[in-house]
């Protein structure tokens, strides 16, 4: 299974949609998490159709910023556990035996609010022990 994350900085842009299609088709990704989609539901559905994914979970943008989407193929057994403006959290049960967690994360771009996003991530990390992949745009430089 291959997972892709991308801060696409406006999925409404034709060039961005075309590039996403090329990447997904070239690497045969199973799950795609996009941040800063900055677009409407109709465009997100259009993108879903051109990359040939059958499922999606959307967190709408707030004003003129943000927006998250998780696309996944029909062959993936994925259940959404929660979402908000900073994350989409899911459980994947690929072969009905080996359950694992997947969190697409978007760190707060506003520096004064970053602790809120990190607190959410800490809360998600405190679940019962099972493998966990957390990926995305953390908007943070780790030294």
Predicted regions and their residues:
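Short phosphate/oxyanion-binding micro-motifs
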Residues: 1-134, 141-142
